[in-house]
Swiss-Prot record:
Residues 668-677 have a biased composition (Acidic residues). It comes from Epiphyas postvittana nucleopolyhedrovirus (EppoMNPV). This is Capsid-associated protein Vp91. It is found in: Virion. One of its GO terms (molecular function) is zinc ion binding.
Amino acid sequence: MSDVVLLVLAIIFIIIFVLIYCTIFFEFDETTFSKRLHVLTEYAKRTNAEHPTPDVLGHVSDVYEHTYIVTWFNTNDLSVYHETVHDDTIEVFDFLEQKFSPAKSTVAQRVAPSASDPNAFVLTGDKSEVKMHCPQHFNFDYNQLKCVPINPCDTRAPGLYAMDEHLLDALVHSQHLDKDYTINAHLQHPTLYLRCLADGSYVVQECPDNYTFDAATSECKVNELCQGRPDGYVLDYFPETLLVNEFVECYESKHVVKQCPEQHVFDRQLMTCVQAHPCAFNGAGHTYITADIGDTQYFECLNNQESQLITCINRVRNTDGQYACSGDARCANLTDGTGQLVHMHVDDTFEYASGQLVCDNFEVISEIDCNTSDVLTNMLFLQKFKLETEFPRQVFDNGECVPATFNNVRVLNDTFPIQNVPNDYNIDMQTSIIGLTDMIPKLLAGDDLDDTFGQNVVLARDVGAVGLNPVTAEPIDCLGTQLFDVLDASRANICTESGDGVLKTLKFENGTFLSVFRDNLTGSDIDYKRFCAISYENSLKIVKSDHFERRILTNILQSDVCADLYTTMYQKYTTLARKYTTTPFQYTYTFVKPPPNIVVYAKNIQLKNATISKPAFDPFANKQIDNKNNLAKPLFDPFKNAVWYSEPDGGDGDHWGPDLPPPVQPDSEPDESEPEPEVSPLILDKKDLFYSCYYELPSFKLTSCYAENDVIIDAITDLRNNVTVDAECEPAKDLHYVLNAYAYTGNGVGCRSVFNDDGVAVIKEPIPSYVFANLNTQSNDGVHYNRHVHVKDGRYMACPDHLYDDVEFRCNVEADKLYYLDNMQF
């Protein structure tokens, strides 16, 4: 019994000992211990003569770029004391002095590739650089900061290569051994071979059964099958290139290809030549080849008697021994369907590589498509211009997709077309403005886009041309049936139907202007004197001058709208009595300034608010005749209406005296028939013209007629206070501030302010003159062309732009001015 107890105790002690040993063994890091021992030994060697060994010693244990770790350990047992992390751009560790000191200079990189040796790399220390080498068949990869195996196909063209000892170790056994492979360099694997692909990648492949790889021809060759077989022995061997009437037999211990007699085929089941159709014994789906077809064709049986010819990109034979098509059509233009095909993009302006297709034996093994989306596609300059060219985001360069620059993109043309966004005037400016290709890199640099655009264009007006060819930038006279330049609207060409010749050149002088919607392109306005002409010579300022206004102070002419309106109002509001009995209007009371500024005054009449009384007599009045003696009465008779005054006592005091008027009585109510004072004459003097311009195209004309008569001023006030409005035009009632103003309010309702016999009215047009998609801008393209029509909260107002109060939605129109609006283009 005691022996059993002792045995059990012994086993227990052994188990405990094993556990303790394993714990110590597995926890103990022999490599780390050896490193610390080496550090301690090195320190002792270099400093023991000067310093005693410290209790704690530090050393740099790990480095990652500019960050390093200092590990401190006890020198008596080499156990870790503590670890600290540091940045070598701030401080460096002096191993011998065992202290830190400030970094004297910043080290750009601790690890760098060697410029002359891909197998080497450079380590930068605090005081010097050390060149290190990777193992053989390795190169240093700076991106990974490590040594990586060399690609076996780096220096080999696409094709098949024998598998030597090094390739076998590295690619098959995944072993990178540091040994001398030159001893067995002549040896190769019999069936395995290396296949280098066109994209630089590789695969390890093996020859079929009964085949051996021939390094001399770089192909798999069939092993001899006729060893020990008699002549005439037919082999059950059918190579891919064997025709339907051919078979393989032995002759002198070698296999040779034989043919069946004419009109015979070789039956591979009967293993003999038969006189029959190739499909007779095999049926539908069987495939075969003949001598009269191409290398990429084969016949496929439809039934026992018919077959069809199949043409492929590449003909192969599958595992069932039947022919089939393989390959990608994109590889068809490559020799043997193997190689690299770089995709090139070419347009009128640029040429660049957009990607790469890599094929091997007519199969696509890799394809790279770079992101060639247009970096300019969403750019709109000056809110209306876009570039009719594309610059890619990426291009294919040196085997990868990289950002596109003018260094890897070829420029084919120094200019490119520019297109403007659609506008309400249907104006196409592609012949007026051409872009310079030098603009593109400046735009990509992020400069002010609008300024960069405007400074890098060519204008037709700058070269004295009506238009420019959008592609070649050459001057042209026609593009279609008419050609004009809205940036220089002084002329236009009427062309033939085919657009190959000029029928007539129009020149717009004073009184005429370019009207784009008229067939003859000519509009007339007696006041217009090319006020919309742009005088800038700087292209940036010209292209920015899309909307501006010209104000002109001039005289009212006898035939213009001011004369017509005020003449009509004067006739209507001039009266002889309080009952507004109108007098026949006479032009002798109307004074219109002709082109020379001549002021014409009326005859001597009493004006309203005059302070000079009437004369006692009129020396030019008709003389009266005395009926008694037929003599003319004197112009002035001092005794007329006189009485003889006699004193009561007589004497010299008697005399003639004037007849005294009756006593002054209170004023009585004037008789309704009492004539009104004569009214002031109609004076037509000044007017303001406001021309709205779309570049050099006059779009709207606002006329401000000055009123210089009290009658007209009162009439204007009366008209504005008594405006009539059609029910459907109630939202547009404020159009009355400007006559002939128009607003489209939606739902087929177009309203216009008019002056008629009844006064000023805002009426609904039977058919709207214009229908706008954008009610707020009163346009179709979202541009506010008419600056004198304003929209707010569903209400419409016509008001000169300089008098409009947007906050209060109010028109601060003057009492002595009447406004009239003309649309000069429609």
